[in-house]
């Protein structure tokens, strides 16, 4: 997703204002990688207060609750929607600047209305990606092994028997984890 997006950016990543919508596993990985690739002005919006604190600690970037502090109109050059809901797509289109790039990754729901007029008149590039190549997977595993994503303290491990409670905790915002791994 990032390689495809960066080819479409008008300016180098380090000059861009970047917004990642969602601080789950996809959003956290994206933010960590964006920081590693040189993104200086980076914000992650996340509704879970505990995750926001984790994002600030592990990524070293600004975070915001989109419910109380939605992204400002035309405030970012590059937006990654790692959630994929109707509300986050609206946030992405509100936040993107003319000539900017929106990368849509999350698939939370089907509901969507895209402001085609804004897309056209503001010359916005809208990209989507779903899966990854074997080369992407190998590069990610190598990056994890090399410690490029930090100490992974933002990943929580629980037993398989604790799986149902893990989903409840994630849904209620009771966990700071961007990812919960269930082990047998």
Label for each model-derived stretch:
Residues 47-48, 108, 132:
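Residues in the short beta-alpha loop(s) of Rossmann-like NAD(P)-binding domains
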Residues 101, 113-153:
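Rossmann-fold dehydrogenase core element
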Residues 1-68:
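Mid-domain Rossmann-like dinucleotide-binding core that forms the NAD(H)/NADP(H) cofactor-binding site
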Residues 90, 134, 138-184:
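C-terminal hydrophobic helical "lid"/dimerization subdomain
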């Amino acid at each position: 997703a990032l390689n495809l997006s960066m080819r479409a950016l008008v300016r180098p990543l380090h000059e861009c204002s970047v917004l990642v919508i969602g601080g789950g596993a996809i959003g956290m990985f994206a933010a960590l990688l964006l920081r590693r690739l040189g993104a200086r002005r980076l914000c992650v919006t996340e509704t879970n207060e505990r995750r926001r604190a984790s994002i600030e600690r592990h990524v070293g970037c600004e975070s915001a609750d989109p419910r109380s502090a939605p992204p400002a109109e035309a405030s970012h050059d590059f937006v990654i929607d790692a959630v994929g809901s109707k509300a986050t797509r609206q946030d992405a289109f509100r936040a993107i600047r003319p000539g900017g790039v929106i990368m849509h990754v999350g698939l939370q729901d089907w509901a969507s209305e895209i402001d085609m007029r804004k897309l056209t008149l503001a010359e916005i590039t809208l990209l989507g990606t779903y899966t990854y190549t074997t080369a992407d997977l190998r590069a990610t595993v190598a990056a994890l092994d090399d410690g490029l994503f930090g100490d992974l303290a933002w990943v929580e491990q629980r037993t398989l028997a604790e799986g149902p409670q893990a989903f409840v905790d994630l849904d209620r915002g009771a966990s700071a984890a961007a990812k919960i791994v269930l082990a047998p």
